[in-house]
Amino acid sequence: MSEPLPSSFEEHPQFQEETSLQKFRRRLKEEPLIPLGCAATSYALYRAYRSMKAGDSVEMNKMFRARIYAQFFTLIAVVAGGMYYGSERKQRREFEQMVEARKSQEKRDAWLRELEIRDKEDRGWRERHAAIEAAANEAANAKKSFPEQDAARSAIEPSEQKSIGVLIAVKELLSRQ
């Protein structure tokens, strides 16, 4: 099953785990030093830019060195966080795979239930229409079984016949005269 199963449950909120904003917040709480290092790098670059505009080359060189230190700090935070949270991330990945498998099974089960309901409705519709057709055939057979009675009725009670049209009514009047 490489393709997802079609269903009306596709966009159901029950089948969504975590949004990108929730994931960003979770990662920010897990490793707060990485965004801190990125902010320090950005601030050092900003100060170096201002020093360059002011023409202060000594301050600009200090800020470029500070940028390098901030980037080193960020890199160390990434590596240390990866080592510290490595086993937890592996467990989380396994958990997310299990959750994904469970959710895909739930979607598949919901899709199958939906198909079963549609199949029951379809069978019910076919049975109703088969019963209606059988009743119509039975009524037609019952009507054909007494043709003499129909002929006698039409001869006795012409006023009860449905009018077929104006032209036929005029022809009937002319034929009586």
Swiss-Prot record:
Pfam families xrefs: HIG_1_N
Record keyword Mitochondrion present: yes
Spans through the membrane: 33-49, 68-87
Membrane topology according to the record: Multi-pass membrane protein
This protein's record includes keyword Coiled coil: yes
Annotated segments matching region Disordered: 139-158
Main location: mitochondrion
Subcellular localization, as worded in the UniProt entry: Mitochondrion membrane
Gene3D superfamilies: 6.10.140.1320
Coiled-coil parts of chain: 96-116
InterPro entries: Hypoxia_induced_domain, RCF1
Swiss-Prot/TrEMBL keywords: Coiled coil, Membrane, Mitochondrion, Transmembrane, Transmembrane helix
Residue intervals of the HIG1 domain: 5-96
One GO term (biological process): mitochondrial respirasome assembly
Range of residues in the leader sequence: none
This protein's GO CC annotations: mitochondrial membrane
Role noted for this protein: Cytochrome c oxidase subunit which plays a role in assembly of respiratory supercomplexes.
Quaternary structure and partners: Associates with the respiratory chain complex III/complex IV supercomplex.
Family statement drawn from the similarity comment of this UniProt entry: Belongs to the RCF1 family.
PANTHER family given in the database record: HIG1 DOMAIN FAMILY MEMBER 1A (PTHR12297:SF3), HYPOXIA-INDUCBILE GENE 1 HIG1 -RELATED (PTHR12297)
Protein name: Respiratory supercomplex factor 1, mitochondrial
Origin species: Aspergillus niger (strain ATCC MYA-4892 / CBS 513.88 / FGSC A1513)
